[in-house]
Amino acid sequence: MSWAVGLWAAHRSPRLGRLAVVVGLAWLGVWVALQYRPDVAVMLIPVGLLARLEGTGAVPGFMLIVGAAMGAAALPRQRVLARVSTAVGAAFFAYGGMWMLQPEPTLGAPTRQAGRVLQSTDYTCVAAATATALGMVGVETTEDEMAGLTGTRPIAGSTLVRAYDGVTRKLAGRATRAVLLSAEVDDLATLPTPMLTSLRLGQASRHMVVVLDAGGETVHLFDPSIGDRWMPRADFDAAYVGQVIVFAPRGG
């Protein structure tokens, strides 16, 4: 759709083509900014919708630019480049949205450690961490249920936004609500526990944990892959993504 709009704009006039490029660049810039600040994104976009758009939301802006470029292309190599870019955009859209077409995972018997839920696969850290945190605030659930609510999929797992969506849906109609916040490491000691966050594992991978105490030189976590874990503050700071899900009384 946005590709066709860009193509139409460029065919209509060079000025409209340039405007389409500017709009596409602005779209990309805003979307990238929202990916870095999901706490702002959930205030602008309903979280249920955002959870489904986060992997594909940049594509309309990109395709608008590509459509305008194709419409303005005068040389054969420019048209070839525009076609290749169109294919790249389509592939990115398919990759980002593929999880919605995948079946939910079939999980084995749950494993608990002192009432906390250990992940049963290498991709269900979000499901296990959210189930653990919810249990700590008095809402019983399972890894299997939270895998469904958080859109967990084999291999790809889930995301912080989908975790927030799943927890929000689980808490619907209850006295407790979830809040997604941006917080510095030094601020975590002032927030109520348990809280959920993701830690960076390399450039692309993320691993969700439950923060139990962030007030000292070590941060006490429940890591659903191994259980209780005490992480040096400097190491935690280096891996922390800057966003947490906390629990608060509804209306408070």
What positions do the PLM features span?
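Conserved active-site-adjacent core of cysteine acyl-enzyme catalytic domains
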Residues: 1-82, 89-104, 135-136, 140-252
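N-terminal signal-anchor transmembrane helix
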Residues: 103-111
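An acidic helix/loop motif centered on a single conserved Asp/Glu
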Residues: 128-129
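Active-site-proximal loop/helix segment associated with metal-binding centers of metalloenzymes
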Residues: 125
